[in-house]
């Protein structure tokens, strides 16, 4: 029965042919083709549906209608629909508009399905694997990530991704073919060694799209500065989770490289007018840009060095904190939401600004400038105003949805992460819902009605595509500078201004890009490492607000904060660890007793519950007064203390 229903759905939701127009075509409901997280915002778009049009949600396994509602302003909402038990597939049918493709609703569906693909991209997209033989003169064809230099900041966001949900990544250690990097920790260490090996490299390389440097000063040919930014993240992570994998001698080499070059490479301050671009989309001097000089990057790097240095006996944390505070104050004073060169114009790097301010409040809230939260509140209000449309898409202006030629991919895929981070800090459920709308946009709730990644046979064969997503981006550019055709998890395209409010026709072009077509048809912008970095950030910050840690009494009836020696308690963690919805998954938390830290294993309470527990007996002979439990690192911690009553 299910196969029949699915076949009917596929036929009902096929792309329209070239002869159809907006006047004749009835657009089907566009849903998040992967599905929706339990207990989070859920919505779809049915373009052209009149207000009041009824819609129904049907369970494809039982053929039963499980939810009903009405469409308003082309949107249908079903946030209150949170089915229990094993995840089933559903479809949405709107009167007169046919049916959607099937989708799931499950615990932490986005994170558990997408997080591995997010770092798999950086495993596959490396320009080389052997650091001893690589020729840096070809950096634009290789580098740590192909089609990019050291400015990609991959290591920073790989480290934040691990810190946000570490037990999830510890379960993924399989390799692909002859790739030498298997898991996220190994990938981080590979990028760290790259950054150290080429910390002072400064060209020459192939010249593309302009030159780098301060306005009025000699031009640089390679972004060597940002190797230090990546090493700073490694040095910070050493003290939280990298010690078992990184020997102290190597760590101290990385730290010394940062300390010796930090001010010489202008890492201590905000850098403006740093590149002169000849690219048609952003010609001229750029105050900030996507190539390693994002507004807010100074906050990230100096906070990470502060975190490193505060653990060292001979450290100098205060100067890095001062520089981080100066960078944050600069953002608070000068970040202009109406200046496109501070916002969408810098495309793939735009997400760094709000995320850097948010990171300050996560990592060291008492040290952040006092106006930090107020600036983020202003940004949140601006975003709500700019997304006041049925796509929930952040528009460019009153007359333009998106760029007429290219938006690259730094908009919706990365914007969700910024919204998640700020919504968590402001306790703003409306902004969090907008963050989920951005992820829906990535998975098909957009004018083209497809995922932003091309579903090629090559990617499917290597496990490089999202399971259950039927319609991928219709065009790919597999053999560009990034050579991303066989790279897992690549994002390939994003709607142009001409595709809004709806794409009239969508032409599928397999395996090639016949130039960049700026008309009505969708086109592939060509994936890029920096684009996927923003998507990685969204998956990182989405965990804020959905993870929780509690300790209950032995009967699991009451939450407690005081315990006695010899008492048995239940530790309860809710986190994005429910990878296999047919078995009980595993997790862990850290228990700190005085100077000792141990790992406590957790098991899911049942199949597909997403809640992980363990019974723990307080040692009878303990003489400490406080036990500390935590999950996560670097500001992403869920933590609590237990007072031991002797």
What label would you give each PLM region?
Residues 43-48, 569-577:
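Aromatic/hydrophobic beta-strand junction motif of beta-rich domains
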Residues 72-81, 604-623:
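Aromatic sugar-binding surface patches on proteins
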Residues 23-34, 546-564:
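Short, compositionally biased P/S/T/A/G/V-rich stretches that sit at domain boundaries
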Residues 9-17:
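Hydrophobic h-region of N-terminal signal peptides that target proteins for export
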Residues 21-27, 39, 100-131, 646:
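Low-complexity, Pro/Ser/Thr- and charge-rich linker/hinge segments at domain boundaries
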Residues 37, 50, 560-563, 577-585:
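A short beta-turn/strand-edge loop motif at beta-sheet boundaries
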Residues 33-97, 127-153, 160-161, 214-244, ...:
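Aromatic (Trp/Tyr) and acidic
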Residues 112-329, 333-343:
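Extended ligand-binding groove/face enriched in aromatic
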């Amino acid at each position: 029965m299910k196969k029949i229903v699915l076949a009917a759905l596929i036929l009902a939701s096929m792309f329209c042919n070239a002869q159809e127009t907006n006047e004749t075509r009835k657009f089907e409901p566009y849903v998040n083709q992967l599905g929706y997280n339990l207990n989070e915002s859920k919505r779809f778009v049915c373009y052209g549906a009149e207000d009041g049009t009824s819609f129904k949600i049907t369970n494809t396994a039982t053929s039963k209608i499980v939810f009903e509602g009405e469409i308003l302003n082309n949107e249908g909402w079903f946030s209150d629909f949170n089915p229990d038990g094993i995840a089933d597939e559903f479809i949405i049918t709107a009167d007169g508009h046919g049916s959607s493709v099937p989708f799931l609703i499950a615990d932490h569906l986005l994170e558990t399905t997408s997080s591995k693909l997010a770092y798999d991209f950086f495993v596959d997209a490396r320009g080389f694997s052997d650091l001893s033989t690589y020729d840096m003169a070809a950096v634009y064809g290789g580098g740590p990530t192909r089609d990019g230099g050291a400015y990609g900041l991959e290591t920073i966001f790989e480290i934040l991704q691990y810190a946000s949900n570490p037990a999830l990544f510890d379960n993924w250690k399989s390799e692909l073919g002859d790739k030498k990097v298997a898991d996220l920790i190994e990938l981080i260490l590979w990028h760290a060694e790259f950054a150290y090996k080429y910390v002072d490299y400064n060209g020459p390389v192939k010249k593309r799209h302009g030159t780098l440097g301060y306005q009025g000063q000699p031009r640089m040919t390679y972004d060597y500065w940002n190797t230090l930014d990546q090493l700073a993240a490694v040095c910070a992570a050493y003290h939280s989770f990298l010690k078992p994998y990184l020997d102290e001698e190597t760590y101290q080499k990385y730290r010394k490289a940062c300390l010796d070059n930090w001010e010489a490479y202008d890492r201590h301050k905000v850098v403006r007018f740093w590149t002169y671009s000849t690219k048609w989309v952003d010609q001229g001097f750029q105050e900030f840009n996507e190539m390693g000089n994002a507004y807010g990057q100074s906050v990230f790097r100096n906070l990470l060095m502060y975190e490193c240095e505060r653990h060292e006996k001979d450290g100098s944390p205060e100067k890095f904190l001062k520089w981080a505070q100066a960078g944050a104050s600069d953002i608070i004073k000068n970040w202009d939401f109406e200046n496109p060169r501070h916002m969408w114009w810098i495309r793939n790097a735009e997400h760094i600004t709000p995320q850097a301010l948010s990171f300050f409040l996560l990592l060291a809230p008492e040290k952040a400038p006092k106006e930090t939260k107020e600036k983020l509140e202003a940004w949140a209000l601006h975003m709500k105003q700019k997304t006041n449309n049925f796509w929930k898409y952040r528009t460019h202006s009153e007359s333009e949805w998106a760029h007429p030629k290219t938006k690259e991919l730094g908009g919706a895929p990365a914007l969700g992460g910024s919204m998640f981070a700020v919504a968590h800090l402001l306790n703003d459920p409306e902004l969090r819902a907008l963050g989920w709308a951005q992820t829906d946009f990535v998975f098909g709730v957009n004018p083209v009605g497809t995922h932003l990644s091309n579903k090629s046979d090559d990617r499917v064969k290597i496990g490089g595509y999202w399971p259950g997503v039927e319609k991928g981006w219709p065009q790919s550019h597999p053999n560009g500078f990034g050579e991303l055709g066989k790279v897992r998890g690549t994002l390939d395209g994003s709607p142009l201004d001409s595709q809004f409010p709806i794409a009239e026709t969508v032409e599928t072009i397999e395996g090639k890009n016949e130039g960049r077509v700026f008309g009505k048809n969708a086109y592939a912008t060509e994936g890029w490492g920096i684009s996927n970095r923003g998507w990685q950030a969204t998956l990182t910050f989405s965990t804020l607000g959905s993870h929780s840690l509690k300790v209950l009494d032995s009967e699991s009836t009451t939450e407690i904060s005081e315990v006695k020696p010899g008492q048995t308690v239940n530790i309860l963690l809710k986190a994005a660890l429910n990878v296999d919805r047919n078995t009980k998954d595993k997790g862990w938390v850290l228990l700190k007793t005085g100077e000792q830290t141990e790992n406590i294993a957790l098991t899911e309470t049942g199949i597909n519950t997403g809640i992980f527990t363990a019974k723990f007996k307080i040692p009878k002979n303990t003489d400490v007064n406080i036990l500390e439990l935590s999950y996560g690192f670097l500001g992403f911690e869920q933590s609590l203390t237990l007072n031991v009553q002797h």
